[in-house]
Amino acid sequence: TDFFIDGFPVLRGKWLKFDEDRFLKKFTEKYLRNKKLDSHRLAQQKGAKILGFKKYYKFHHVPYALRKSTFESFFESNKEIEVENIRYKFRNLNQFTPQGLINHLEIKNKTCVLSNKLQLIYMKPIRKSLWELKYKLNSFSDNKLFLCLQSLDQCKPNKLKYLLNWLTFLVK
C-alpha cells in the first residue's frame, strides 16, 4: 500500500545533517539577527540524536505511517524519556516529536521502508500569487498522493475561492 509494505511503515523523506553540522546554518544563526528557529525540524533532529544517529531523516508534510506497538515498546522501556518530553505545558525546544523519534527507531531497527519519493504537493498559498497558485495546482499529476495547503485561513478571498473550487473538482 502507500503506507505499509509487508507490514513495515513507508517513511518518506531524505537524510540531512543536523543543523549544527551545516556550515550555512551555523553562519546564519551566528551573524543574522532575525533568525527564525524551525522548532519542528529541531524536534525531529532531537529524536534522531536520542537514538544515537549522526544525521537525521527529515520527514515532510505527508501522512506518517506509525505503529502503535513501536511506541508502546519504546516508552515502556524508556519511561523517563517520555516523562521528560511531556512535562512542558507548551511546545519547547527541549522536546522531540514522538513521530520523529519513533520513525528513527524504525530506521535503527530496520523495520521500515525508506522512500525519497514524497509524491507531495506542498505550498503556502498566502506566499504565492494567484497565477503561481494556478500553475502549481495544474501541475498536480497522477503520481502525487498527498496535498498539503498551509494557512488557508490567511488566504485572500479570491485565492481561497480558487482553491476550494479546485479541491471540489478534484474529488468529483
Sequence positions of predicted segments:
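ER/Golgi luminal nucleotide-sugar-dependent glycosyltransferases, focusing on the catalytic module
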Residues: 2-172
